[in-house]
Amino acid sequence: MSISIGALVLVMVASSSQDDKIQTLQKLVHELREDVAELKNQKNETWLNQQRAEEIRSLVLEVLSDADTRYSMRGDGVLAGYDGGAYLMSLDENWKLKINGQLQVRWLYNNADRQASQRGFELRRTKVIFSGYVVDPSWTYKIAATWGRAGGSNTEDAWIAKKFDNNQWIRAGQFKAWFLRENIISSSKQLAANGSMVNNAFTYGWVQGVSTGWNNEDVNLFVQFTDGPWSFNTNALGPSTNAWIARAEFKFGDAGWSDFGYLTSKIGAKDGLLIGVAYENYNTDTAGGFEYGNANADESYGWTIDASLRGDGWNLFGYVVETTGKDTVTGFEQDSSGWLIQGGFMVNNNYELFVQYQNGEINNAVFATGSSEMSAFRIGINYWPVTGSNNLKWTTDVAWSHDSLADGGTVTGNGSADWTGTGNGWRQDILNGDGQMLLRTQLQLLF
C-alpha cells in the first residue's frame, strides 16, 4: 500500500514537472512566432523601399532621356532669361531675340479760351518690340509694331544693321531720323508725358532709307539719306524725294552714351555733358511739298544745336532749331524757329520734379486765327513706384500757353503752323483766343 502511494506521488510529481516544461515551450513558441512576424514585416518594408527606389530611379532616367531628346532637337541649345527685356539666345551667342513692350495709358484735360473744354482717356502708345542679332552679334535688327489710338496697327522701326570692327556701322530700312535730339530720345525715356510743340513742328519722325555712322567713347557721327520727313510705311513708286541729315555729338564727363539715352537722371547717376549739332536738307517732286518746319515746302534746309547736362539726381536739357522751307513753284519762302529748355530734380529715389519752357516763331506769318508765335510753360512730377526700376512710371504735368495757337496754312505764303496735335494734347485756338491749359496724367509700363 505504501509502495503504491509512493509511486503515485512520483507520477504526480513527474506530471507536474512536464506541464511546466510544456508551458515554457508554448511560451517560447509564441515568442518565436512574434519574432518571425516582425522579421517578415521588416523584410516586406525593405522590399517596398527597394521597389520605390527602383521606380524613382526609372522615372529620373526617363525624364533625363526626354530632356536630352528635346535638347538634341534644339540644335546647339537655347539660353533664356531677362536682361532689359525677355530674351532667347543660342549657346554660342550668335543668335539672339529680345522682346520688349511699351504701354502708355493717359488721361488729359484741355481748357481753351472761347472753346468747350475737352477731356478723356487714351492709349497713347502700345508697342511690342523685337530686336537682337543673327549669324553673329555684328548683324543686328529691330522691328517695332504699334497699335494706334483709333485702331489698326502700324510699324515704326524695321531695319537691319551691320557693325564693323572700326566702330563704324551701316543701317537700312525704317528708323528714327536723327535731327532733333528730343525726338531721338525714346518716348519711354522723356521727362514730360509727351514731346513738345517745338518737336511736333520740326521733327522728321520715322523715315525710310539708309544711314551710317562712327563713334568712340567721346564722339558720335551720323549721316542719313532718306525719303524725307515722316516717310515711314510708304512704297518706292511715287514722287521722288532726296533728304539728308548729318549729326555730330560730343560727350564729356563720366556718363556713358547709354546714360544720355534718358532725359531723366536718377540719384547716383554719373555726371556728364553732351553737345549735339545737326543739319537737315530735302527736296521733293511731291506736289505742294511736305508740311515740315511750319511750312508747306518742296525744299527745306535747317540746323539745330542741343545740350544735355546730367548729374547725381538732376538734369538740364535745351536746344534751338531753325529751318527755311521753300515753295519753288510760287517762290514763297518761310523761316521758322523754336527753342526749349527743361530741367528735373530727384526729391528722393522715387519722385522727380521738373519744369519746361518752350517758344517758337513763324516769321512774318499771318493766320486767319492764331498768332505767328508760340510759348508755353510746364511743371510736372514723375513717380517710379519701384525704387531702382524704370518698368513702371507715372507722370503728371500741367502747362499753360501764352499765345493764340495757330494751326494750318497762312493767309498768304507757304507758312503752315504745326505746333498742335492730338499726340501732345494742344488744340488750335479759335477766334484768336489766347489762353489754353493742358493737364496730362499718364501711367507707363515697360517690359
Describe each PLM feature range.
Residues W47, D113-Q115, W159-A161, I267-F447:
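Outer-membrane beta-barrel pore domains
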Residues A7-Q102, D254-F260, Q442, F447:
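N-terminal periplasmic/intermembrane-space "pro-region" immediately following the signal or transit peptide
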Residues M1-A7:
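Sec-dependent N-terminal signal peptides
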Residues L79-S231, L237-L274, Q334-A365, S372-F377, ...:
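Outer membrane beta-barrel
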Residues M1, M12-A14, G413:
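Intrinsic disorder/low-complexity segments
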Residues L25, A37, I56, L61, ...:
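General helical structural elements
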Residues S15-S16, E31, Q190, K393, ...:
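Short linear motifs centered on Gly/Pro in flexible linkers and helix caps
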